Amino acid sequence: SLSTKDKETVKAFWSKVSGKSEDIGNDALSRMLVVYPQTKTYFSHWKELTPGSAPVRKHGMTVMKGVGDAVSKIEDLTAGLMELSELHAFTLRVDPANFKISHNILVVFAIMFPKEFTAEVHVSMDKFLAALARALSEKYR
């Protein structure tokens, strides 16, 4: 679970990187589709799945808006993300095993923000993204 220090670290780091959300989301989603090709099945309705394509860029931004929303609801992720959990469970039917983007977001943070993404920030962001994935999985139980 997230300590008070983790929450402070996540909020502080997010305030530094959120202005680059579109680029972070595009790169993270592009990487996910390459590294975890099985995730492409959820996006088969898109005309183009290549890294950096318009649909990938657009959905990457959507994902990062969700991450930003989660940062603002960090005190109670499960309640705060219930609507998003229901969407993924009942409408999109995404298997929680395919919530693979968080690892790619961490990679992109490390690449884009090498000075700011310290080991301490890495640990807190990893814990936060794991908590976010658990909150999104809530409606699958």
UniProtKB/Swiss-Prot annotation:
<feature type="binding site">
    <location>
        <position position="59"/>
    </location>
    <ligand>
        <name>O2</name>
    </ligand>
</feature>
<feature type="domain" description="Globin">
    <location>
        <begin position="1"/>
        <end position="141"/>
    </location>
</feature>
<dbReference type="InterPro" id="IPR002338">
    <property type="entry name" value="Hemoglobin_a-typ"/>
</dbReference>
<keyword id="KW-0813">Transport</keyword>
<comment type="similarity">
    <text>Belongs to the globin family.</text>
</comment>
<protein>
    <recommendedName>
        <fullName>Hemoglobin subunit alpha-2</fullName>
    </recommendedName>
</protein>
<dbReference type="GO" id="GO:0072562">
    <property type="term" value="C:blood microparticle"/>
</dbReference>
<feature type="binding site" description="proximal binding residue">
    <location>
        <position position="88"/>
    </location>
    <ligand>
        <name>heme b</name>
    </ligand>
</feature>
<dbReference type="InterPro" id="IPR000971">
    <property type="entry name" value="Globin"/>
</dbReference>
<keyword id="KW-0349">Heme</keyword>
<dbReference type="GO" id="GO:0005833">
    <property type="term" value="C:hemoglobin complex"/>
</dbReference>
<comment type="function">
    <text>Involved in oxygen transport from gills to the various peripheral tissues.</text>
</comment>
<dbReference type="GO" id="GO:0043177">
    <property type="term" value="F:organic acid binding"/>
</dbReference>
<dbReference type="InterPro" id="IPR009050">
    <property type="entry name" value="Globin-like_sf"/>
</dbReference>
<keyword id="KW-0007">Acetylation</keyword>
<keyword id="KW-0479">Metal-binding</keyword>
<dbReference type="GO" id="GO:0046872">
    <property type="term" value="F:metal ion binding"/>
</dbReference>
<dbReference type="GO" id="GO:0042744">
    <property type="term" value="P:hydrogen peroxide catabolic process"/>
</dbReference>
<dbReference type="InterPro" id="IPR012292">
    <property type="entry name" value="Globin/Proto"/>
</dbReference>
<comment type="subunit">
    <text>Hb2 is a heterotetramer of two alpha-2 chains and two beta chains.</text>
</comment>
<dbReference type="GO" id="GO:0019825">
    <property type="term" value="F:oxygen binding"/>
</dbReference>
<keyword id="KW-0408">Iron</keyword>
<dbReference type="GO" id="GO:0005344">
    <property type="term" value="F:oxygen carrier activity"/>
</dbReference>
<keyword id="KW-0561">Oxygen transport</keyword>
<dbReference type="GO" id="GO:0031838">
    <property type="term" value="C:haptoglobin-hemoglobin complex"/>
</dbReference>
<dbReference type="GO" id="GO:0004601">
    <property type="term" value="F:peroxidase activity"/>
</dbReference>
<dbReference type="GO" id="GO:0031720">
    <property type="term" value="F:haptoglobin binding"/>
</dbReference>
<dbReference type="GO" id="GO:0020037">
    <property type="term" value="F:heme binding"/>
</dbReference>
<dbReference type="InterPro" id="IPR050056">
    <property type="entry name" value="Hemoglobin_oxygen_transport"/>
</dbReference>
<feature type="modified residue" description="N-acetylserine">
    <location>
        <position position="1"/>
    </location>
</feature>
<dbReference type="Pfam" id="PF00042">
    <property type="entry name" value="Globin"/>
</dbReference>
